[in-house]
């Protein structure tokens, strides 16, 4: 079973576990055009992206500045907050998957829309 097949299975399971507010996306960095790197996505409505779209600006900057000469960069980043152009608050994690030779191949991202959770928390505080 290939690496991408395994990543797709994991992505699907995570999306099923956490529901429609959880986007899970896989980028293939070996494509000719990194701005069209999405090869798999679950719940793309969270960021309004689909197959063939590109990474977020933050991930794109990391990819563009990586020279693939060190195993230490870029580093995975878990639990950071992002705000979408339409105002959603996302809690995100990004993992950089390397080939056996150490070169970047995939980016595995989890983007969880916590806007509703924050709104419900705020509402319950107001009602207290």
Segment roles from a protein language model:
Residues 1-32:
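Short, extreme N-terminal leader segments that mark the start of a protein/domain
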Residues 13-17, 62, 66, 123:
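Residues that form generic nucleotide/phosphate-binding pockets
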Residues 19, 30-33, 87, 100-102, ...:
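Short, solvent-exposed coil/turn segments at beta-strand boundaries
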Residues 21-78, 85:
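Structured interaction and signal-relay segments at domain junctions
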Residues 62-120:
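Sensory/regulatory domains in signal-transduction proteins
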Residues 121-127:
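Conserved small/polar residues in nucleotide/adenosyl-binding loops
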């Amino acid at each position: 079973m290939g690496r991408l097949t395994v990543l797709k299975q994991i992505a699907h399971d995570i999306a099923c576990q956490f529901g429609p507010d959880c986007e899970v996306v896989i980028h293939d960095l070996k494509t000719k055009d990194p701005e069209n790197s999405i090869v798999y996505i679950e719940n793309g409505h969270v960021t309004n992206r689909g197959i063939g779209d590109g990474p977020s600006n933050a991930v794109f900057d990391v990819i563009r500045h990586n020279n693939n000469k060190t195993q230490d960069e870029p580093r995975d980043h878990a639990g950071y907050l992002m705000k979408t152009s339409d105002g959603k608050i996302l809690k995100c994690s990004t993992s950089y998957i390397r080939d056996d030779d150490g070169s970047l191949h995939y980016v595995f991202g989890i983007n969880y829309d916590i806007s509703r959770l924050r709104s419900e928390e705020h509402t319950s505080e107001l009602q207290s």
